[in-house]
Amino acid sequence: MNRLSREVPIDPPHAALLIIDVQNYCIGASTSEYFLRSLRDTVLPNVRRLQFACRGAGIEVIYSVIENMTRDGRDRSLDYKISGIDVPRGSSDAQVLDEIAPAEDEMVFRKTSSNLFISTNIDYVLRNLGVRSLIIAGIMTDQCVESAVRDACDLGYLVTVVIDACTTTSAERHEQSLLGIRGYCRQRTSDVLVAEISVNSSNQSD
C-alpha cells in the first residue's frame, strides 16, 4: 500500500513561501478588471498575512519577478520575445509591489521565462536552504504559478497553493487552473494555512 501523501502539514524549518511575479509590470500590462480588482482586494491582503505568518515562524519568504538580465532583452526566452514581455534590467517594472515589498535579506529571483525553475537557480538555492515544502502564491494562476507548481512537484517538493493568494484574468481561468493542478499540490485558503503555520510553529518551540 502506498502511504505517501501530498497532505503533509507545513514544517516551518523546511518550508519556504514563494511569491510569484507580484510586481509593477504585471499591473501596468493588464487590462483585466477582474485581475486588478482581485489582486487589490484579495490577493495582496492575503499575501501580506502569509508574509507575516511565515516570517514569524522562521519560514523563508522568497520572490520571483520577471526581469531581463540585459536592458535590450536579448536574453529573454523565445516565448517572451514572441509575447512581447520585456522588463528591462533595473527598471521600476521589475520591482515587487510596495504593498508586499521584500524585507531585508529576503531573496528575489529574476526570471526571463514563464517557468521559474527553468530560468533561475532557485532549485539549487532551495536545496541549500534545506527546503522540502513550498507554499506558492502570486500571479498568474494559470501561467507562471501553474508552471512553478508542476515543476516543483516533479523536482520532489511538497507544494501547497494558497488559492485566495493567487489570481489571473478571470475567475473561470483561475478555477480551471486550480482544478488542473489539483493532482500536484495541496490547495488551501490563506485562513487555513495561516492557522496551520501558527500551530506548527508553536509545536516547534515547545
Predicted stretch roles:
Residues 16-26:
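Acidic-leg catalytic submotif of subtilisin-like serine proteases
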Residues 13, 31-66:
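A short alpha/beta connector and helix-capping loop motif
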Residues 60-61, 65-83:
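Early exported N-terminus immediately downstream of N-terminal targeting peptides
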Residues 30-32, 75-76, 147-150:
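Short amphipathic alpha-helical segments
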Residues 25-29, 71-73:
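Short acidic/His/Gly/Ser-rich catalytic and metal-binding motifs that mark active-site loops
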Residues 1-16, 49-57, 80-206:
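Active-site-adjacent betaalpha module
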Residues 22, 66-68, 164:
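Active-site loop/turn elements of alpha/beta-hydrolase fold enzymes
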